[in-house]
Each structure stands twice: as C-alpha cells, then as structure tokens.
C-alpha cells in the first residue's frame, strides 16, 4: 500500500491485486474501507479476490494471468504476497535451534531459544515485526543479561502506522477485537475534510475512530486515516497506555485548527 502511493505520486498508473476481499488484514474494518475509498479517488485501481496464476514477460512488459482467466498487461510488477522470517542459511539446523512451521525461531518470554546460549528477538521470532519493538526487545535483553534488571516488553497497545497516501495511524484494539473482549463497546467516529484541504481544494478526507468500554469509560482503541496519522496517534498512544477515559478526552481542550482536535470534540456516537 505504501509503494502503491509512492508510485502513483510519481505518475505511475497502479493496479493492486488482492487475494482477499480487502487489503490490510488485521486492521480495523472501517480503516480498511476508508483507505481504499480514498486511494480509488486518487486513481489507484483495486482488484480484490484476485489470485495470480502466472506472470508472463512480453516485449512491452508483463502480462498478469489470474486464476479467473483475466489478463492485465503492465510495465512492471511488484510481487509482495507476504513475508516469512529470514532464518535460512544461518546454520540454525546445525545448532539444533527450534523453528516453528513458518521458520520463525521459537523463544520464551526472555527471548531464549531451546539452546541455552542462544537468544533471538525481533522479526526472526515473528511476533510484532516493527522496528521500535525490535529496539525495545534488544534493550530488555541487554538490561536483563548485563544489568540484572527485571521486566518484560509489553506487547499491548503498540501504536502502528502505515505510510500510505493517505496514511494510517492506530493504537489499541480494533472494533472486532474490542467487541470480542468486552460486552459493552461504544463506537465514536468522524469523517471530515481538514481545513487545509478545504482551502487548497483537495478532496481528500480524514477519518477518526475511538472505541470505549461503556462500563469503565476507558478508551481501548483509536484509529485514523489522514495526513500525519502516525504523528497524531503516537501522542494518543501515551494516553491509551495510561488508561485514559473518554471523559478525560472530552475535558481536554484541543489545539485549533488541527485535525487531532477532532479526537476531543468531533466524534459522533454510532
């Protein structure tokens, strides 16, 4: 999704083939729908539920053949169908290091493998594959081994961004996860055109969503699609981790004119 936005911004006609009915599996459903709608407005084409059977190189580029019998001719193909831990050719099998079915290194809560002298962390363990998480895991392990400091990395409420165009920022539970975990979820969301887009004539809109446990008033999820979504959600991630309630958000005075203030004043209960 990120490279689709980059290439489109450089003037390339972009078509996204997606095996599922939607892109960005695991993200909040509203976020997935809103992003695709905005990207379509920009001129990016989506082909959901499409499986590529083969890619044929021709004089003018490539022809994509789908299992449904469709063909699409293009200048270039970026083939990105997922990723697996890059643990091949490390000699792990010679050392007896245990791997799971996707070749991720199996570790315990202290990042120790089944071989006592070998530790592993970050993407090769296939847990939360984000750079800041890798940094946190590395610092934890160094402190535990060499500074005798206790503690563990907390994998809940890790903020995440997708630098698509428009970008995504998210922290906490999706609506589906929240409804599975709690019986009383209130949903607040807003869809608006930021002031700078109104003045510039841009049609790009921004979407924000907040999930609240009704019985405790605790905010358990915040999601956004729009300019600087990652920058905005990073700040709110602190509030989520601190256990902020909706009342705290409601009583916080926002900065005007900003998009972020809509998380305080502009949400509609649905």
What are these regions (language model features)?
Residues 17, 65, 99, 107, ...:
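Hydrophobic alpha-helical segments, especially N-terminal targeting/anchoring helices
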Residues 54, 96, 110, 209-211:
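Short, surface-exposed charged micro-motifs
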Residues 98-101, 148-157, 184-188:
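A short alpha-helix-loop-beta-strand transition element characteristic
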